[in-house]
């Protein structure tokens, strides 16, 4: 079978990583087309990859006959139009989060995809492909902790881009814990509340940081998340699940734990998301490529998962303003098997 020909749209940090990943570490695929809103950047990336060329218009890149599948690493505001083009051209697509930037358009994408014979959209929630998260999921599903009752999460970044505001902590950071909650517990989130502690003096004036998110699932499980994106330290992601017969935690350390001055200890902390989750990204893309080549098109989070995350985050942004718990309202999930197709 010939290699899957992939168009990578958006070659900033994430997109350029995907080009390098597909070119050097993924089997059964190659990058045939790249696109970016900065054409010179796309031309530079294309010149470094054999058999790759830059296409100026992202919709032309999707429609290109030398493209079998698409990776979207473009700004979220462009996703709706690009996803619609992928559906129109029946091109499987790996879409980095968010699915779209609002709940209504995310739901419309879900409904349109459900009208097709096979799903085409996979959403890039990479933690589902991380070795530690997969082990934690297996532990829960195997019943070793008994009924999971509570989950505690930490999500810290050393810093954020200049355009970041308080709502993006919910939409860009908390969204990962939202998907982790749904993935680990296998149920939807019923409500979300954002609590605002004393803000970090080092945070930009327009950013309320840290924030504490409190999620409640439909069965009543409690999840709390510390979101602190201006620590100035490192990238820290930890998750602890407490069950009726014990608990389990991941993300405690990276590398050597050392003893130094009396009464202290320490180790290495991942400086960024690529160091912490680089292997998960590799696994995610390889499994997606394998699924597309096999004709199933997805092996991971679906368009519905992207929509559900958007709905929870929308409730979170509302709670950020009010400080109160906000219910999450989800539409009925479309059933592909019951939809009549012309």
Task: Please give the residue ranges for each predicted region.
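C-terminal helix-rich "cap/oligomerization" subdomain common to oxidoreductases
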Residues: 1, 69-72, 290-342
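N-terminal Rossmann-like dinucleotide-binding module
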Residues: 1-49
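Active-site loop of classical SDR/Rossmann-like NAD(P)-dependent oxidoreductases
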Residues: 17, 37, 273-286, 301
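Conserved SAM-binding strand-loop segment of SAM-dependent methyltransferases
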Residues: 51-58
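Beta-strand-loop-alpha-helix segment that lines the small-molecule cofactor/substrate pocket
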Residues: 69-76, 80-125
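A contiguous active-site-proximal alpha/beta segment in oxidoreductase catalytic domains
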Residues: 100-160
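Mid-domain beta-loop-alpha active-site segment that forms a flexible
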Residues: 124-132, 155-190, 208, 217, ...
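Contiguous beta-strand/loop segments that form the cofactor/metal-binding neighborhood of enzyme cores
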Residues: 172, 176-255, 282-295, 331-342
